[in-house]
Amino acid sequence: MKAENEQRTGLLYGFGAYGMWGLVPLFWPLLKPSGAVEILAHRMVWSLAVVGLALLALRRWGWIRELLRNPRKLGLTALAASVISVNWGLYIWSVNNEHVVEASLGYFINPLVSIAIGVLVLGERLRRAQWVAVGLSFVAVLVLAIGYGRPPWISLVLAFSFATYGLIKKKLNMGGLESLAAETAVLFLPALGYVLWLGAQGQSTFAAHGVGHALLLAATGLVTAIPLVFFGMAAIRVPLSTLGLLQYMAPVFQFGLGVLYFHEAMPPERWAGFSLVWAALVILTWDALRTARRSRARLEAAAPTVLATPAREPA
């Protein structure tokens, strides 16, 4: 009963995390007339403030000494910070420049790009269904490129930057709050310097558009940290396969907002490209669930054998 309650709580946290990530396109336009770079700089500054307070409340500081003593981890943290800043900055720009649908595509194809990176960088071997999914996504990009009259570069940069970020995070092996604190700390001084420089040049929007605008810019820290905390609470309570399915909530919400709320154009060739991506994701999800089910069945079949084997006395 307790396990069921924990899993139910984890699902609620998961829905909360991916729901907030899916609805975040509604937030960034509220920060206009701030530009994408100014918003990104404030996001870095205020995220560190929020996460720093959270870590202070939780008394989780031991990791800092270990990180500072490990040059390799420091380098990977700096690299992760650079990659995620590209991802965040481009996403903010795309939402505020009427490219919400194309941005959502980036997060739809992100699992497929992660698989491709696994093959190219880590030498992983794909199952047949995974090859089919990757092939379909490649055809989808070609169809969308024809439809847009250009490669869907926003989608590709978002997908590859986030997949690269995931690869670096895998090597870092740090908790969500800790890694966010470390990454924003790396970029804190440049971000703060840029905010102060804008103020000195008379180009800052922070104090020029009233208290409400200043509070919204400061809220970028909460918008960044709260979904991450919810995701962390979900990750320890629900199976990874469930999280894998929940991750599609965010781009589904973003796509829906782009079409229904922001009224972005969806000509037939764009529908065709997205349909190919969705077909690839259905195949990928089916294959992942089938593989997980088979692995679980093998473990259950092996368990009685292990239990039935008599223990040998030490020689």
From Swiss-Prot:
Annotated membrane topology: Multi-pass membrane protein
Domain of life where this protein originates: Bacteria
Keyword GTP-binding: no
Entry annotated with the keyword tRNA processing: no
One GO cellular component term: plasma membrane
Keywords: Cell membrane, Membrane, Transmembrane, Transmembrane helix, Transport
Pfam families: EamA
Residues covered by the EamA domain: 19-146
Cross-referenced PANTHER family: ACYL-MALONYL CONDENSING ENZYME-RELATED (PTHR22911), SOLUTE CARRIER FAMILY 35 MEMBER G2-RELATED (PTHR22911:SF137)
Family: Belongs to the EamA transporter family.
Name of protein: Protein RarD
